Every structure is written in C-alpha cells, then in structure tokens.
Amino acid sequence: MFWLSVVLCAVAVRGNPTPATMPESYDTIIIGMGAAGCTAASTLSKAGKRVLGLEAMDRVGGRVNTVPFGDGVVELGAEWIHGQFPSRVYDLAIQNNVSILPQDLDFDVYRSDGSSGDKQLLNELMTFSLGVVDDPPQVPEPLGEYITKRLMDYIKTNHPTLLQDKDFIDNLLEFLDLVIDNYESSNSWNDVSTETRYTELDGHQHMSWHRNGYKTLFQILLNTYKNGPGYPTLDIKLKKEVSQISWPQDPNADVVVSCTDGTTYRAKNVIVTVSLGVLKERYNTLFRPQLPQQKVTSIQKLSIGVVGKVILEFEKAWWDKTKWFPFIWKSDDKKRLSDDEEWVTNFSGVSPPMGNSKSLTLWSCGEVAKLVETLPEDVVKRKVMELVRRFMGKGKTIPEPIAMLRSSWFSNPYTRGSYTYDNILTPQYPNARATLAEPLLDSSGAPRVLFAGEATDNTHFSTVHGATDTGFREASRLLPTAKL
C-alpha cells in the first residue's frame, strides 16, 4: 500500500451499509475507479443508469495519484496527457476551461564524474534511436537488439571515431536501455518487441495538468469539479476490496459481487477495470465460474511493468527549471560501487515536475523500481542524494532535501504494476489485448462481465486516454444507442 495516500476528489457515498444477507441491486457495478472505471461510471450515470463503483483503495484515480507536496502538487503515477487529437482526456480539460500546458524541456547531460556530457551528440544519437522504433524490422525481434544494430550502423557512418571509445558506447547503450524502459515500464529493452500496434495521438506528447493536478480529470468525470453535485444515480464505495464475481448463465439471474468485508452487491452486469497485475495475481479466485482459457492465456502472456518515482523537495530550486538532466555513468565509477549500491545506476536522470517549483523527480523502472519500494526511507533518501551530488554537484553545494515521496505501484496489492507494454511474445499472441477485452456472455448472448482498462486497448495501452477510451467502450456496449 502507499505510505502516503490521499483522496483525489470528494465523492459522495450514498446509502447506508447493507447487511451481507441483503445484497443491494444496481444496473451495473464497476470494479476499480481509475480512469477506465470513472469514465464508464460517468457515461452510464449520464444515461440514468444506477451504478455502483467499488474501489479497494481509499481514493479514486487508480494509477493516477496527485499528491499535495511543497508549494504545489506532484504526480506519483501518470504524469502527462500523451497527445491531444483525438483525446478524450485533453478534450475534457479544454471543455472545462482547465489549463493544460506542454512540458517542453531542454536538457543538460551529466556524467558520473561530475563532468558535462556532449549534449548535441547525445541528442542526435537519442533522437535516432527513438526514431528507429517507428521503422521496425519485417521479422520481429527484441527492441534493444534492433536499436543497438541500427545505432551502431549509424555511428559507423556518421561518427566512426566513437567506435574506438568502448566505454562511451557501452554506457550510451545502458542509458538508452533505461530511456526505453522508462517509456515502456519494462525491466530491459530486450523484453520489449519491435512489433507493436501502439499509435501516438497527434499533438504534443507531454501535456501537463501542472498545478491543477491529474486529479482534476476525475473531478470532471464524476461531476464534482468546482463543487459539482456528482451524479444522483452513482454510488462510490471506497475501501471495498472485491473477493469474488459470480456471473450467471441464466439471463434472469444477477451478477453477484462479494467483498472481503462480507458485503455483497447485485447487478445486471459488471465492468472489471482492475490492472493486468491484479488479474495475473487473482484471476483464479476472482471469477466464478472461472475465466475461459483463451482469456487466461491473454492474462498470462501480456506484460505489465513498473515505473518508479522518487520525488525530492528542497527549500528552493538550485537547478534550471526548464531542463531535465540525464545521467550517464562511466564504467570505472560503476565498478567502484558495492553490490548493494548497484541499484542507483538504474535511475536515468532527474526532471522537474510542473506542479511544483521546488522539487525534482528521479525515475527508475523494472526490478530496481520494485526494490526501491521496499528499501528503508532513510536509505533511499541518502543514496539518491549521493547520486544527485555525484552527477550534478561539481562546483556547487547541493542542500539536503526537506521532504521525499516515492511511488509504490508494484507493492500496492491493488495495482501490482504501472502499465502494460508489448513484450517479445506479442507476435505469437497478437490478439491478446482484444481477447482480454471480450465480455463474458450469458446463455442469451447478453454481456454480464465486461473488461476495461489500459491493458485492453490495442493501440493506446499504457496511457490514461487509452484507459478512458476503454471505459467508454464498455459503457457503450451496455447502451446500444451510444456512439462509439
């Protein structure tokens, strides 16, 4: 669980607790009130449906978590709106006159001996490396291997003398691995396939809610923005962990949802929006009868990774707020680290969040992000400050931070990861996401258990706009007159 958790927005919880022997009945129950769940709840409530949202955490938002920090807010989860056109998330902000700003950051490169790296060269090589992702090979292969081959050919043609500097090449490739992993949430860029259906939206890819916070999206979705009244037919119950979903074949029977606190609820249908990480852990016990084998296979073969953040607050900013700062190690400096310090080499750099003027975010991913969640707070703080001073402290005195936050997306039992990516099994299971999205039907062909969430979107998985699209998709499946 989060060691710091906040309620993202005020949600009216209507009705009195119901004894387990007398289940409450709704049109639709939504399990998980993240971006997909809140979008589905909003869509159905606007249509007059009686909806119950069950959320295991003590807040709505799911893998979006806006936290008050210092002189503003920071995002422990999703940071940006990725693209503008067409984006349900961006449109909602604009329609409600919420300021959304592009985060255009220049950068300065730092090496582990405190020297400055060649910014122009790194920009050229990084731009090329990220660009070849859009030019995949005919036969799919691990993304890291493909980028490495293409980059080496590029360097051989355009910067042949660099090939003599093995230390630079090795550490450049390790840095690019971290950059890809932070995009994908993977542990290694060789866990990612060159074959993907992911499609970027048009427009700026890093639009920030800045001081408004991503929490504003959920206030808009639930009609509580600017003290809105909410929806009269929507109930949201927090701290409600679902233990079992019993779905019938009989068209006249209800779906029954049981919670760990003994309460039970009934509905015509259920929309399940929990993360792939939760499905992986609980699919055997959560559904009765159990899921069909093809859906189980999709859950097993898809991958969810972890992106971790450590956010430091200082008395005042001592860095250029218009830049992010990549860290590239030198091999000799790495060799001097002890085995229990090696995890610090997994941070790709630091960047300033837009919702706060005195904070820096350090980014990690994969197994190291999982490890950082479990280490004592004082150890994390001490080691990341040693890292920051090693790279950025040459010729200056960097003060101690006055506060620290860190994410815990893997250790949180209600998320078990950050977001999904297309792994190297993707070519063998190209329809895994579509299969995961298929509803479970009763004997009449009516959908009884529906599935939403970023993992179920073929082209916009891993994003908030992808998650919201799936929530709208499944709500629309229950509203035949809706326009998809």
Residue ranges and their predicted role:
Residues 3-484:
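FAD-dinucleotide binding site
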